[in-house]
């Protein structure tokens, strides 16, 4: 049975950027851009007759910016996942977008793997953050209940929990290997297993999982 395609909408006021992103996503058979518009106003209008699974929205646009578009989409189309695009890695901006209902963030220097990861992450887990966001910010996001990610149930070993705690302390693989008397390769393999077990994409996902499950406080 053929899988249902993930339907996408793209809102960005730079036509060349839209075209480039559409070309990039066209390499993935399971993804389909059904709407591309230059501003938030047209995006919100389009969703009435052409609903999508994920809306990818630039923050800075004329007529209606990404912040207001996010607010309206979350109000009118609560099942639509939203990925915000921005040039600025500003925690203040991230909080504003979270308040309006965004599910994740991409800086506009992303590569193809990052945007595809983000699309699948918001569909599967309800969120996506890159590794540039700070641990303190992730902790605030979780404790303020601005985001409610869905995590798969998993059975972590004591060693994996130790590694998660050290990752949350921003230790490198080398530092973790020294602390736990393991080889760096073993730590790297354990990190990959942890990511697969808890169904996240990156270190930010590990930290969110740890906060959600009281592995760190």
What feature does the model see in each segment?
Residues 138-166:
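Regulatory hinge/linker segments at domain boundaries
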Residues 61:
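Receiver (REC) domain active-site loop signature in two-component systems and cognate sites
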Residues 39, 65-68:
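Acidic catalytic/metal-coordinating carboxylates
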Residues 192-217:
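Basic, Lys/Arg-enriched C-terminal extension of HTH/homeodomain DNA-binding domains
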Residues 51-56:
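Active-site beta3 strand of CheY-like receiver
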Residues 45-46, 67-79:
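Short amphipathic alpha-helix used as the core "switch/output" element in two-component signaling
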Residues 58, 86:
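Active-site residues of response regulator receiver
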């Amino acid at each position: 049975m053929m899988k249902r395609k993930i339907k996408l909408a793209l809102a960005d006021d730079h036509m060349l950027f839209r075209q480039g992103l559409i070309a990039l996503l066209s390499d993935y058979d399971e993804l389909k851009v059904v709407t591309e518009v230059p501003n938030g106003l047209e995006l919100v209008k389009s969703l009435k007759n052409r609903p999508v699974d994920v809306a990818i929205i630039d923050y800075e646009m004329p007529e209606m910016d990404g912040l207001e578009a996010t607010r309206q989409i979350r109000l009118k189309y609560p099942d639509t996942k939203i990925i915000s695009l921005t040039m600025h890695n500003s925690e203040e901006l991230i909080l504003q977008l979270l308040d309006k209902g965004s599910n994740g963030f991409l800086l506009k220097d992303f590569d193809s793997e990052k945007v595809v990861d983000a699309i699948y992450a918001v569909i599967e887990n309800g969120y996506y953050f890159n590794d540039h966001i700070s641990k303190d910010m992730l902790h605030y996001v979780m404790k303020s209940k601005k985001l409610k990610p869905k995590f798969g149930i998993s059975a972590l070993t004591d060693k994996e929990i130790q590694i998660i705690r050290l990752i949350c302390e921003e230790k490198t693989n080398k530092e973790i290997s020294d602390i736990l008397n393991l080889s760096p390769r073993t730590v790297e393999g354990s990190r990959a297993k942890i990511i697969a077990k808890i169904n996240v994409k990156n270190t930010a996902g590990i930290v969110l999982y740890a906060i959600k499950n009281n592995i760190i406080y």
